[in-house]
């Protein structure tokens, strides 16, 4: 599977490639021609192992939920396992993000999650704003 929708952001000193179709991840970051994040080839991405490269939002939870289960308000919730037997790094990194705005040096993207998808009981919406300014992100 290849992901063709790559957003390229650029300043005189910074270059950033964003993959909205692949979890809104930063696939490449270059500063003064030095690779901060080495890009990976989108043709070899395994969708359920996309946490193994680049930088992405850990939404709605970070790290691991042991045995993919948690309790809240005396109810037990079972999440989809994406690192068996655990759930890891949320699920926004697995979803397609939509581009709301783009300039040469910035982008705003959004991910909308439906309740109960991947076992997560609540719907949510999350935004990323990425802006390059000279030597800052």
Question: Which stretches of residues belong to each language-model region?
Answer:
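Surface-exposed acidic/polar loop and edge beta-strand patches at domain peripheries
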Residues: 1-136
């Amino acid at each position: 599977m290849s992901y063709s929708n790559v957003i390229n952001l650029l300043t005189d000193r910074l270059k950033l490639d964003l993959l909205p179709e692949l979890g809104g991840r930063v696939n490449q970051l270059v500063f003064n021609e030095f690779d901060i994040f080495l890009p990976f080839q989108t043709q070899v991405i395994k969708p359920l192992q996309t946490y193994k490269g680049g930088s992405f939002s850990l939404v709605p939870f970070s790290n691991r939920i042991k045995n993919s289960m948690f309790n809240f308000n005396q109810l037990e919730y079972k999440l989809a396992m994406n690192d068996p037997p655990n759930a890891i790094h949320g699920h926004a990194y697995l979803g397609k993000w939509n581009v709301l705005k783009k300039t040469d040096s910035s982008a705003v993207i959004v991910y909308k999650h439906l309740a109960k998808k991947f076992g997560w009981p609540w719907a949510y919406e999350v935004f990323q704003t990425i802006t390059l300014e000279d030597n800052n992100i």
